[in-house]
């Protein structure tokens, strides 16, 4: 089957702590941190958006893939925060990495799983022989209304994956999706901030879809949790991630490397791609990964992945995810509000 030829991450350097947001709204930061298992989040600068994040991640993926960008036959950017309502982010990325003009490109939307949907689309095109390589990116600059619970977690970041058949660093053994019409989270056209169903986003939405997708794939592959060295799940907060991992039977040593939300917040479409990139940074050949995304509305994509020995040849050819996790500068709420354009004149 098709596999990952190159991967790359990008996280903005600015951070705001839960304590700073809670101070402004006169909330108890300790109860928020305990309830969400989130301590700080990544904030995009004034000159950063989904397009710039996607370009940086794509360039890092190309460094590891060591391919001619002209051989990329498809570019898909999954996000719920594309900078233009009518103007594709994917064409900006394709032009920036010198992949144009002989390719197809499109923007994808499915809440937080649009990036993994792009990976599946690239897998199909590569497997069919229609393209040699495909580039799938999950990136977001998520927003939460001032004072809303989402403001403590809605963050920015993304990761890119080049899919192909030759010189793969990780092989896709299989994929499985679970999808229903579940309105747990939404944003109307023209509205700046999303609305959500509060606790309804848990059991009937996130947990139902992630668990069923994971179980469906393991049944399809004939595997059990102990057959995997690592697992990565969508992470709207740290609590949901750990709980779903334990429900499915995974242990801390399997899930901890993919858990990034406590330190950068929920990067939405970038969440599973970034968690997976950190796992790949720490993998060895022969190790196996289960990755399961989730997008409100609602659906989950699950992937069974086996890492090849080539991983050690490419890990250090681009900045690792840990570099972006450690590269940070703290800002206060005033700067955060300025960067995120929360002050309307």
Swiss-Prot record:
Pathway: Metabolic intermediate biosynthesis; (R)-mevalonate biosynthesis; (R)-mevalonate from acetyl-CoA: step 2/3. The active site is at 80 (proton donor/acceptor), 112 (acyl-thioester intermediate), 234 (proton donor/acceptor). Keywords: Acyltransferase, Isoprene biosynthesis, Transferase. GO terms for biological process: acetyl-CoA metabolic process; farnesyl diphosphate biosynthetic process, mevalonate pathway; isopentenyl diphosphate biosynthetic process, mevalonate pathway. It catalyses: acetoacetyl-CoA + acetyl-CoA + H2O = (3S)-3-hydroxy-3-methylglutaryl-CoA + CoA + H(+). (3S)-3-hydroxy-3-methylglutaryl-CoA binds at residues 28, 112, 153, 201, 234, 243, 266, 296. CoA binds at residues 199, 239. GO terms for molecular function: acetyl-CoA C-acetyltransferase activity; hydroxymethylglutaryl-CoA synthase activity. It comes from the Archaea. Its EC number is 2.3.3.10. Gene3D superfamilies: 3.40.47.10. The keyword Transmembrane helix does not apply. Belongs to the thiolase-like superfamily. Archaeal HMG-CoA synthase family. Catalyzes the condensation of acetyl-CoA with acetoacetyl-CoA to form 3-hydroxy-3-methylglutaryl-CoA (HMG-CoA). Functions in the mevalonate (MVA) pathway leading to isopentenyl diphosphate (IPP), a key precursor for the biosynthesis of isoprenoid compounds that are building blocks of archaeal membrane lipids. Interacts with acetoacetyl-CoA thiolase that catalyzes the precedent step in the pathway and with a DUF35 protein. The acetoacetyl-CoA thiolase/HMG-CoA synthase complex channels the intermediate via a fused CoA-binding site, which allows for efficient coupling of the endergonic thiolase reaction with the exergonic HMGCS reaction. This is Hydroxymethylglutaryl-CoA synthase.
